[in-house]
């Protein structure tokens, strides 16, 4: 696997270190537990394949407006997040993921708090923070709201990963997210929230601190 250097610097804060991807972190993420449907698109099991792991690392280390981080706690990978610094809508945060074995300790909130605090200081003229999330991801929404995000739009969206799996699962598996999906114009769609956080919006310090 390549050991190519990346120009992205680490970020420290809220008990975490957000580090750029490297071969060791890819190995750790490959060993994470998986959530499965309907959150399967975030699972990292594909990194167990050496070819896919190498390809993913190459993408993550490319010089790009997209910066990819792995949140580490005492050297252990506990979450991941990416940000597009040149999206027309704002500083677009995406690929927010905490594996099940690290849930319940505020990793998501702390990871985003560290990232946004750093970007606000490093890019004083940068626009607002934006992220989108499928409406069934309610635990994530609690974290986003605690950090000052507000829903500014609700839309129906074609999510390729969700749509492909919906063709394969039965009514029983679809039922828990039934009110969040629809079959429209010949394909499956999922309802999505667009969240926005204005620069300087207070973050819930209790929600973001290490536990």
What are these language model-derived features?
Residues 129-141, 157-164:
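Conserved beta-strand-loop-alpha-helix junction that forms the acyl-donor binding cleft
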Residues 144, 149:
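Conserved active-site tyrosine of GNAT-family acetyltransferases
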Residues 151-153:
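A secondary-structure capping/hinge motif
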């Amino acid at each position: 696997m390549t050991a190519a250097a990346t120009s992205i610097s680490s970020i420290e804060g809220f008990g975490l270190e957000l580090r750029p991807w490297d071969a060791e972190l890819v190995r750790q993420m490959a060993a994470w537990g998986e959530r499965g449907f309907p959150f399967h698109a975030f699972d990292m099991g594909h990194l167990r394949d050496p070819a896919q792991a190498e390809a993913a690392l190459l993408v993550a280390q490319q010089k790009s407006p997209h910066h990819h981080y792995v949140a580490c706690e005492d050297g252990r990978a506990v979450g991941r997040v990416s940000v597009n610094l040149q999206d027309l809508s704002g500083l677009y945060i995406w690929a927010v993921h905490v594996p099940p074995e690290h849930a319940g300790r505020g990793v998501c909130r702390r990871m985003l708090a560290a990232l946004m605090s750093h970007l606000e200081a490093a890019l004083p003229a940068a626009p607002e923070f934006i992220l989108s999330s499928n409406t069934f991801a309610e635990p994530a929404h609690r974290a986003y709201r605690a950090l000052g995000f507000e829903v500014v739009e609700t839309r129906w969206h074609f999510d390729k990963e969700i749509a492909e799996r919906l063709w394969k699962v039965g009514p029983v598996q679809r039922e828990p997210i039934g009110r969040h999906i629809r079959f429209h114009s010949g394909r499956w769609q999922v309802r999505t929230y667009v969240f926005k956080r204005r620069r300087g919006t207070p973050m819930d310090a209790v929600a973001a601190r290490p536990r």
